[in-house]
């Protein structure tokens, strides 16, 4: 999945743009759960599996929930 696809799924889960982190990373925040997650935003490049798992875990979602968004 690319960063754009991951961000779309996080938006569907209630995450909003919080702030720009260092370089090309974005902090996403969910006001309903109070959770934050960092997404590397490198256009056109797929996010590595381990990084994607960390984003999903930080978001408080299961892999199945995330993929169904």
Task: Annotate the PLM regions.
Residues 8-10, 18, 59:
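Short linear sequence motifs
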Residues 1-14:
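Polyanion-binding surface elements
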Residues 8, 23-25, 68:
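Intrinsically disordered, low-complexity segments enriched in glycine/proline and serine/threonine
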Residues 4, 43-69:
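C-terminal structural segments of small proteins and small subunits
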Residues 17-50:
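A short, structured beta-strand/loop element
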């Amino acid at each position: 999945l690319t960063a754009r696809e991951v961000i779309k799924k996080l938006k569907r889960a209630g995450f909003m743009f919080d702030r720009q982190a260092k370089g090309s990373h974005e902090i996403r925040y969910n006001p309903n759960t109070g959770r934050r997650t960092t997404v590397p935003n490198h256009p056109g490049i797929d996010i590595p599996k381990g990084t994607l798992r960390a984003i999903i875990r930080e978001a408080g979602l299961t892999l199945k929930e995330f993929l169904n968004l």
